[in-house]
Every structure is written in structure tokens, then in C-alpha cells.
């Protein structure tokens, strides 16, 4: 089993995830690509001291980007990563500003 600091890479904070945090008490994290739901749940409970109700995971695939420059078309790609959507117990809350 990995250390909790290795499992949770960073929180993903966007307008959509802020709405999820406020309305449904769900938090979104980028996690290690080989981490399973049990490791993710254990890591969140240990790092933030909260009670996790559910864990949903998904893989955000890499996207191809292209741009046209003086040298012609240039192709690149974003990296793929694994996301975890954590649903907390209704009495639990994570405050990212105090970290």
C-alpha cells in the first residue's frame, strides 16, 4: 500500500468542482494512476481527517493539441491523468485555504 502523500497528487479546483463542493459535498483530486479506490479512501481520511462516504474514479485521457506556426503545423499532447471524485459524509468538510 502506498503512502497517502503518494496517492493524492493535488486537488482539482475549477468552477464545476467548486459547485460540487458547495452543493453535494464532493471533492475532486488528481490521484496516482495505479491507485485503487481503497487506497484513495484511506489516503483522504488520513490526510484530511474526514469520513469518506464514496469514491468514484475516472481516467482523463490525453488530448492532442495542434497549432500552426511559420514552420507549419506543430503537434503536441496534454498528459493523461486519473481523477477521483470523493463524496464526504454530510458532517465532514475539507478547507483547502487552511492547508
From Swiss-Prot:
Gene3D superfamilies: 3.30.70.330. SUPFAM superfamilies: Ribosomal proteins S24e, L23 and L15e. The keyword RNA-binding applies. One of its GO terms (cellular component) is ribonucleoprotein complex. Keywords: Ribonucleoprotein, Ribosomal protein, RNA-binding, rRNA-binding. It comes from the Bacteria. GO terms for biological process: translation. Pfam families: Ribosomal_L23 (PF00276). GO terms for molecular function: rRNA binding; structural constituent of ribosome. Part of the 50S ribosomal subunit. Contacts protein L29, and trigger factor when it is bound to the ribosome. One of the early assembly proteins it binds 23S rRNA. One of the proteins that surrounds the polypeptide exit tunnel on the outside of the ribosome. Forms the main docking site for trigger factor binding to the ribosome. HAMAP family: Ribosomal_uL23_B. Belongs to the universal ribosomal protein uL23 family. This is Large ribosomal subunit protein uL23. It comes from Hydrogenobaculum sp. (strain Y04AAS1). The lineage of its organism: Bacteria, Pseudomonadati, Aquificota, Aquificia, Aquificales. The gene is rplW.
